[in-house]
């Protein structure tokens, strides 16, 4: 509740019905102001909720004096004559006065009429909600009048005079002629104005009726309240069956004075009364939602605002009218520290708690509920809901529909068409289709190139695309390639001329790569010059000439076979042709030498020589960087013809860069495509994508911006996808964390995945998201959305699911309980805990939800939920020896019923000790919870779970009796909200509980429980005095609810020889730093008979093993004779024990099953996190938790104790802890403990502590 405004008046009030909330107040009859003023006023107040500078306390906007005080006041609806409505006052002097609200605000004379038909005070009045001009008034002696505010002289009376006053009146909200009244005599009368007679009377058991409220939706439902302090009840009546109320709402401590049933939501009701409280209810279910901040005096009137039910006003006799909101979800402010330090005062140890004013409705009010709604869902889903028509009073329901939705159906169909063709591998069809539909020449050229690259002979197709097909050589004229040959007349010399072969006669157009390296034609030429034996010619020649000429030096080198020297001589003399002829005889190295020398002399002129120089020298970079861009196509053909495959992509990229820098984007795109440079061509395509979107927006079409963008992006993705497929692209940057060359492409993939997912094609979206790098910024969110939308919902694990049933006793499934064993108690479902995670332990019952995970474990491994994870406590063995540290017992005949335990009570001794650092500020705090002072239930059996049964254990003379419940404090008009711990006997001081009587202390508090007399059945000298506290860690844990004062003595423990006192579940401590309760022993002491009976059910009871025989009986008088016990069947002989399997050493984790490794990892990580952040004071507790978790891991490593289904439950708990869902983790832990006790070894306490510590650790 947020307190918005306060009106400093003790007055009756009414809300205006206009849009701006106004309040009218009239001085309340029967109240005295703080200054004892007798002035009576009618005042108007404006809330000014929108004014930020408006203070909490208001000032009236209009005020007039009246002759009498008000019992009640009402504000009618506006009308044509009265635009602000009419204010009616029920006056103490018996008059009915009417004022015009508009004139009151204007400061004019506002009195409309004053009528005195009533002979006594008018106690109540109300306007008819269906006929605003009709007003009903009720008062003393049973007087009931109905008025017409337009003509008050026509008022008529209903009924006759009666002995009792009518204190309340209410019009039916559905039938305008039905009126109900409630009298101080306890009768509720329903009137019918058509007949002007009472049609029905409800008997309220003679209890005065103080308030009536009609159901806003059901005309036959009626609420009544009584102001009787003994029976402060709200009754819900159904007039169809008026013999008894249909429901009873009980929650007030004293009489109820006012009711207000919300007109907009029949599930909301507000009541207030003499207990100073204002409660919020659901009258249809009887549930109490919460409570407004408590006043310091009676709250006599409360009302919803009729136009804005979020606002509620409540008037009280403490002189305030409070305007506040219906609910507040913020945490309440912690109460101030207590200053009372009187140790003798009972309430000093139980400080009064200021009740928190925060609660949330369990359901949304109807005015917040939408009758119809729609929402887009991820994956192309459209979710719509609408409210079903339900009869009045029936639970409301809604219908939800999930349908598919597509922003642009063309986008979805285009995506499906492309994906189908791509899966078939029909790349050519995709290219042809897109080329035909291309909007620009650039786009068409891209698809044509992609188709050419997709062919098996891609380079050949590129050459054809550029217009350089190989077949063009056939069209070359023979004259261009013929070489003129000299004609010589053959002479008859006997030398036969060579016969040319038909193939050799054809002129070959060799590739340029074999221009100099292929010497086949030269070989053929020389071979044609074969010598003929005996051939003689008439052309003699000299090998050597006269002198040292060039020819002579060359000839000498030739005849010596030194062709290299001959070549050098020719090159020196610039005889290049002769050098080539000689180089053919000397080998390829000489040929290359001559080529190099020749090309160096020509210096690239003509151009074909520079080109051939680049080809021969395998240096095509000269062509790429220096060739004129006007011949880029010829350059590309040269690269396709001569470039090595390893250099070809880089050469194409370099050529494309030159072209792109010159401004020809389309030609550059071609080069990038041919060179398989995806990162280069993508940047160009992104620019083309943006241009296509701009062009689409400028066109006069009905397409939306989204549709244009989606279609353009679809074409872009199709080109990229086909290109990746053609070049078999492998992305080597998926593992990088930044600096991606394809960053622009990844952005488009993300956009495209979002679009196709919005059209329901989640598998397609997932495929493109898989192409993104792992660390790409937008990839993680997109992947998670698709993964969550495509994954199947796993069935909810039973160990974490919320149980809808109430507490279920499991005793029936365990069979009869053998004598000496405690019947297992039912375990209630786990609720939220409000304990301090750093507080020391205090006792609760085993099923309580607020125990200490660090308290010593006794005979059970059970640790309730919500425990304090860092409370210092000594470590105790999980199964201590029975009776080892308790008082001795007197044993009687086995099986004999025990006498009732003696009663002995005493105040707990005061112990002053240094609390150390236990009260450090916790990491997590919770708002305090309002509690009442608990009382101790009487003991009807020695064991908490066997109420009404006699104890099977004998009671020894040294056993201490159960505590006597303390008397309640005197009841006042407004009892304080306080909590305390019931006094119980202190624990034994030594091993056997003996202690000198001089240590006993008495409590002089008037509210402390008196000491009880010695129980019957014990000799007077044997009554043991109360024992003092002890610091031994092996004493029994104390019993009782947690103390509310952190410095008050903690409740003491009972000795082991006595069964635990059945106390109610202890509520969580109100103080966030108060000691948290510790677990009480849920198991009974060991049986005290000679032999144990065999189990009577298929499932053995859980508890300590029976003793083989009783110890010797202790001294003391034996108890009286009892009935003989039933005969017991001896147990069957034990089977021979099998040798234990070999165990792996502790700490070994190499044999943990694979299905448990995830759980072990999560628990270990969270344990390390807690250990690193826990305060140093709680290091022993953290270490003990680590040790207990290690025991669990050892069990898993050895394949023992924990079954596979339990491992699944533990994995779910570990996942819940990792996800900080501690409520689910606690529920899962309780499920395992309840259903699989036999598997819960010492590790269960460690698991429970880890949940609590993890919850408390930020």
Curated annotation (Swiss-Prot):
Low complexity: compositionally biased ranges: 792-805, 845-874, 1135-1144
Location of the protein in the cell: Cytoplasmic vesicle, COPII-coated vesicle membrane; Endoplasmic reticulum membrane
Compositional bias segments (type: Pro residues): 896-909, 963-973, 1035-1044, 1061-1075, 1083-1120
How does the record say this protein sits in the membrane? Peripheral membrane protein
What are the record's GO terms for cellular component? COPII vesicle coat; endoplasmic reticulum exit site; endoplasmic reticulum membrane
Q: Where are this protein's WD repeats?
A: 6-46, 65-109, 117-157, 161-201, 204-247, 251-291, 294-334, 375-403
Query: What's one GO MF term for it?
Result: structural molecule activity
* Keyword Protein transport attached: yes
Give one Pfam family: TPR_Sec16
Q: Keyword annotations for this protein? A: Cytoplasmic vesicle, Endoplasmic reticulum, ER-Golgi transport, Membrane, Protein transport, Repeat, Transport, WD repeat
Q: Which domain of life is it from?
A: Eukaryota
Q: What is its main location?
A: membrane
Q: Which InterPro entries match?
A: Sec16_Sec23-bd (IPR024298), SEC31-like (IPR040251), SRA1/Sec31 (IPR009917), WD40/YVTN_repeat-like_dom_sf (IPR015943), WD40_repeat_dom_sf (IPR036322), WD40_rpt (IPR001680)
Transport in keyword set: yes
Name a biological process GO annotation.
Answer: protein transport
Annotated region Disordered: the residues are 470-511, 792-1153
Function field: Component of the coat protein complex II (COPII) which promotes the formation of transport vesicles from the endoplasmic reticulum (ER). The coat has two main functions, the physical deformation of the endoplasmic reticulum membrane into vesicles and the selection of cargo molecules.
In the record, the note on similarity to other proteins reads: Belongs to the WD repeat SEC31 family.
Query: What does the annotation say about its assembly with partners?
Result: The COPII coat is composed of at least 5 proteins: the SEC23/24 complex, the SEC13/31 complex, and the protein SAR1. SEC13 and SEC31 make a 2:2 tetramer that forms the edge element of the COPII outer coat. The tetramer self-assembles in multiple copies to form the complete polyhedral cage. Interacts (via WD 8) with SEC13.
| Protein name (database record) | Protein transport protein SEC31
């Amino acid at each position: 509740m947020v307190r918005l405004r306060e009106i400093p008046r003790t007055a009756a009030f009414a809300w205006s019905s206009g849009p701006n909330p106004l309040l009218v107040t009239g001085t309340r009859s029967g109240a005295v102001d703080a200054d004892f003023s007798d002035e009576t006023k009618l005042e108007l107040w404006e809330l000014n909720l929108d004014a930020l500078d408006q203070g909490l306390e208001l000032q009236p906007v209009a005020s007039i004096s009246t002759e009498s005080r008000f019992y009640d006041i009402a504000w009618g609806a506006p009308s044509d004559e009265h635009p602000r409505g009419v204010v009616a006052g029920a006056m103490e002097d018996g008059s009915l006065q009417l004022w015009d609200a508009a004139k009151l605000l204007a400061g004019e004379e506002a009195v409309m009429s004053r009528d005195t038909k009533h002979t006594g005070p008018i106690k109540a009045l109300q306007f008819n909600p269906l006929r605003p001009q009709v007003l009903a008034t009720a008062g003393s002696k049973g007087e009931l009048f109905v008025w017409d505010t337009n003509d008050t002289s026509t008022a008529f009376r209903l009924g006759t005079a009666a002995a009792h006053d009518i204190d309340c009146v209410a019009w039916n909200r559905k039938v305008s002629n039905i009126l109900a009244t409630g009298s101080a005599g306890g009768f509720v009368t329903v009137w019918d104005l058509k007949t002007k007679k009472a049609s029905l009377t409800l008997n309220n058991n003679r209890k005065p009726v103080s308030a009536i409220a009609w159901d806003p939706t059901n005309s036959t439902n009626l609420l009544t309240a009584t102001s009787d302090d003994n029976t402060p009840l709200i009754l819900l009546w159904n007039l169809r069956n008026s013999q008894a109320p249909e429901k009873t709402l009980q929650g007030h401590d004293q009489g109820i004075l006012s009711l207000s049933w919300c007109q907009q939501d029949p599930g909301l009701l507000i009541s207030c009364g003499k207990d100073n409280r204002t409660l919020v209810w659901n009258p249809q279910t009887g549930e109490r939602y919460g409570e407004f901040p408590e006043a310091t005096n009676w709250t006599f009137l409360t009302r919803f605002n009729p136009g804005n039910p979020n606002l509620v006003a409540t008037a009280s006799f403490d002189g305030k009218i409070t305007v506040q909101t219906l609910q507040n979800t913020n945490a309440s402010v912690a109460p101030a520290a207590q200053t009372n330090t009187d140790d003798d005062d009972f309430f000093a140890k139980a400080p009064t708690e200021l009740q928190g004013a925060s609660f949330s409705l369990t359901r949304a009010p109807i005015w917040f509920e939408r009758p119809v709604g729609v929402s887009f869902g991820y994956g192309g889903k459209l979710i719509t809901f609408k409210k079903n028509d339900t009869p009045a009073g029936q639970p409301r329901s809604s219908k939800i529909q999930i349908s598919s939705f597509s922003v642009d159906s063309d986008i979805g169909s285009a995506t499906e068409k492309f994906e189908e063709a791509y899966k078939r591998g029909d790349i050519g069809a995709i290219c042809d289709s897109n080329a035909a539909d291309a909007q620009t020449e650039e786009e068409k050229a891209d698809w044509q190139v992609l188709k050419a690259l997709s062919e098996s002979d891609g380079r050949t197709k590129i050459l054809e695309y550029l217009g350089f097909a190989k077949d063009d050589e056939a069209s070359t004229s023979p004259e261009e390639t013929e070489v003129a040959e000299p004609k010589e007349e053959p002479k008859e010399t006997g030398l036969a001329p060579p016969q040319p072969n038909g193939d050799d006669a054809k002129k070959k157009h060799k590739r340029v790569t074999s221009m100099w390296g292929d010497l086949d034609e030269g070989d053929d030429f020389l071979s044609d010059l074969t010598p003929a034996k005996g051939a003689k010619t008439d052309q003699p020649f000299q090998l050597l000439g006269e002198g040292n000429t060039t020819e002579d030096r060359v000839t000498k080198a030739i005849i010596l076979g030194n062709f290299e020297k001959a070549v050098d001589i020719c090159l020196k003399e610039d005889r290049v042709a002769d050098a080539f002829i000689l180089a053919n005889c000397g080998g390829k190295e000489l040929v290359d030498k001559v080529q190099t020398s020749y090309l160096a002399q020509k210096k690239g002129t003509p151009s074909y020589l520079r080109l051939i120089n680049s080809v021969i020298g395998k240096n095509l970079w000269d062509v790429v960087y220096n060739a004129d861009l006007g011949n880029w196509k010829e350059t590309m053909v040269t690269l396709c013809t001569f470039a090595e495959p390893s250099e070809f992509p880089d050469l194409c990229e370099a050529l494309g860069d030159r072209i792109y820098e010159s401004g020809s984007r389309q030609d550059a795109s071609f080069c990038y495509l041919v060179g398989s440079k995806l990162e280069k061509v993508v940047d160009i395509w992104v620019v083309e994508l943006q241009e296509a979107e701009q062009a689409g927006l400028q066109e006069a079409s009905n397409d939306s911006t989204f549709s244009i963008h989606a279609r353009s992006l679809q074409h872009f993705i199709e080109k990229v996808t086909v290109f990746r497929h053609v070049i078999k692209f492998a992305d080597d940057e998926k593992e990088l964390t930044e600096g991606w060359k394809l960053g622009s492409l990844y952005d488009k993939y993300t956009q495209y995945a979002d679009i196709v997912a919005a059209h329901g094609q989640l598998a397609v979206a997932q495929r493109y998201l898989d192409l993104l790098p792992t660390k790409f910024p937008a990839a993680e969110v997109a992947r998670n959305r698709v993964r969550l939308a495509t994954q199947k919902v796993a069935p909810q694990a039973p160990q974490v699911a919320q149980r809808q049933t109430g507490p279920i006793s499991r005793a029936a499934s365990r069979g009869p309980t053998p004598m000496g064993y405690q019947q297992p108690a039912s375990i209630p479902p786990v609720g939220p805990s409000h304990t301090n995670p750093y507080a020391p332990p205090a006792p609760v019952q085993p099923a309580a939800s607020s125990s200490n995970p660090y308290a010593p474990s006794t005979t059970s491994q059970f640790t309730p939920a919500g425990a304090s994870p860092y409370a210092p406590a000594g470590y105790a063995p999980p199964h201590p020896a029975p009776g080892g540290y308790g008082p001795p017992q007197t044993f009687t005949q086995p099986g004999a019923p025990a006498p009732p335990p003696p009663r002995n009570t005493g105040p707990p001794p005061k112990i002053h000790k240094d609390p150390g650092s236990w009260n450090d500020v916790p990491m997590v705090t919770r708002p305090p919870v309002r509690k009442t002072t608990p009382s101790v239930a009487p003991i009807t059996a020695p064991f908490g779970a066997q109420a009404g049964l006699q104890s099977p254990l004998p009671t020894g003379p040294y056993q201490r009796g159960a505590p006597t419940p303390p008397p309640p404090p005197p009841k006042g008009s407004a009892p304080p909200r306080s909590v305390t711990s019931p006094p119980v006997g202190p624990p034994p001081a030594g091993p056997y509980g003996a202690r000198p009587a001089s240590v006993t202390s008495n409590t002089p508090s008037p509210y402390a429980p008196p000491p009880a007399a010695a129980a019957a059945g014990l000799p007077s000298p044997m009554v043991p005095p109360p024992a003092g506290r002890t610091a031994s860690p092996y004493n029994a844990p104390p019993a009782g609810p947690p103390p509310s004062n952190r410095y008050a003595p903690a409740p003491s423990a009972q000795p082991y020889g006595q069964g635990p006192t059945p106390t109610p579940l202890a509520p969580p401590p109100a103080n966030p730093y108060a000691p948290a309760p510790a677990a009480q022993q849920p198991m009974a002491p060991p049986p005290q008979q000679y032999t144990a009976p065999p189990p009577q059910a298929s499932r053995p009871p859980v508890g300590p093993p029976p003793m083989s025989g009783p110890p010797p009986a202790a001294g003391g008088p034996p108890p009286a004779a009892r009935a003989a016990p039933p005969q017991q069947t001896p147990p069957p002989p034990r089977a021979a024990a099998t040798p234990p399997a070999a165990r792996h050493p502790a700490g070994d984790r190499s044999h943990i099953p694979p299905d448990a490794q995830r759980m072990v990892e999560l628990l270990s990580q969270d344990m390390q996190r807690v250990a690193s952040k826990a305060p140093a004071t709680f290091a022993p507790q953290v270490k003990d938790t680590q040790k207990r978790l290690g025991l669990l891991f050892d069990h898993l490593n050895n394949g023992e104790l924990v079954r596979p289904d339990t491992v699944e439950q533990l994995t779910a708990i570990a996942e819940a802890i990792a996800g900080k869902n501690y409520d689910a983790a606690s529920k899962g832990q309780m499920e395992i403990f309840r259903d699989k006790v036999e598997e819960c070894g010492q590790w269960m306490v460690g698991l429970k502590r880890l949940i609590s510590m993890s919850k408390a650790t930020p």
